[in-house]
C-alpha cells in the first residue's frame, strides 16, 4: 500500500514475502505492515526486507526498515508464520547498544566465526558487531566501508568460495545507478573493488542493478537455472 500524497516518495508501507523450492517457480504474499501494526504509530515506509533464521527460536524472521511519521527510519525485526506469508509478531528494534538516536536503514546480517556482523546504510555503509543475533550491536568504527564516492545504500555480504575473503556489495545510487564492492579478510580494513565492470567484478547481461543480494547455489541448482533461462555459459 502506498500514499504518495501523504507520505512522499518513500511511501511503500507493505512488504512482499516470496518463497520457492527451486528458485524458478515462486509464490508471493503481500503483507501490509502499517495496517497490521497500528500500535507502532503512523508508519510511512517499510523498506528493504531481508530474512534470517533464528536458531534459538527455530523460526524465520524478517528484518527491515520502518519509518514512522515524526520519527526516524530504523531497523526492526518480526517473526513470520511457518508458511512465510505474513509477519506474526510486533516488530521490535534490532538492538544497538546503546540505542541509536538517528536514522539507520538497509540492514544485512552475517554470522562469521561466532560473531554477527551487521552492515547498515548510515551516512555511508557502516559495520557493527555483536555476539547476539538481535541485540548488543556496536559499530566497530565510524569508517565508511563503501569506498566508491557518491550515495550508497543496501549492503550485502558474502564469502568467496575457498578463501577467507568477504565481499561487501552495495548500491551506489549516484548517476548512473550501479552496484559497487569492497573486500575484507578481517572486518577491519575494506579494500575498494570499484563498481561493476570498472574493476574485477563483472556484470555480463545486466546493468543499473539496485538493492542486490547474492546467495550460494549448488551445482544442480545452478544447472537447473541455466537450463530454464537458456544460459549457455555461466
What is each model feature region?
Residues 1-234:
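Carbohydrate-active catalytic/glycan-binding domains of CAZyme proteins
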Amino acid at each position: 500500500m502506498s500514499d504518495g500524497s501523504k507520505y512522499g516518495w518513500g511511501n511503500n508501507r507493505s512488504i512482499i514475502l516470496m518463497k520457492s523450492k527451486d528458485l524458478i517457480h515462486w509464490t508471493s504474499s503481500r503483507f501490509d505492515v502499517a495496517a497490521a501494526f497500528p500500535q507502532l504509530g503512523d508508519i510511512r515506509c517499510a523498506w528493504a526486507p531481508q530474512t534470517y533464521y533464528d536458531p534459538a527460536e527455530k523460526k524465520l524472521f524478517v528484518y527491515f526498515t520502518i519509518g514512522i511519521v515524526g520519527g526516524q527510519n530504523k531497523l526492526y525485526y518480526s517473526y513470520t508464520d511457518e508458511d512465510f506469508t505474513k509477519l506474526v509478531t510486533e516488530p521490535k528494534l534490532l538492538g544497538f547498544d546503546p540505542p541509536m538516536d538517528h536514522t539507520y536503514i538497509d540492514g544485512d546480517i552475517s554470522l562469521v566465526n561466532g560473531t554477527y556482523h551487521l552492515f547498515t546504510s548510515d551516512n555511508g555503509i557502516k559495520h557493527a558487531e555483536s555476539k547476539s543475533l538481535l541485540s548488543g550491536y556496536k559499530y566497530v568504527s565510524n569508517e565508511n566501508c563503501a569506498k566508491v564516492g557518491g550515495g550508497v545504500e543496501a549492503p550485502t555480504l558474502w564469502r568467496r568460495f575457498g578463501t577467507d575473503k568477504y565481499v561487501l556489495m552495495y548500491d551506489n545510487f549516484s548517476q548512473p545507478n550501479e552496484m559497487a564492492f569492497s573486500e575484507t579478510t578481517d572486518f577491519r580494513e575494506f579494500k575498494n573493488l570499484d563498481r561493476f565492470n570498472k574493476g574485477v567484478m563483472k556484470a555480463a547481461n545486466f546493468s543499473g542493478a539496485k538493492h542486490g543480494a547474492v546467495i550460494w547455489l549448488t551445482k544442480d541448482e545452478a544447472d537447473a537455472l541455466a537450463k530454464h533461462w537458456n544460459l549457455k555459459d555461466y
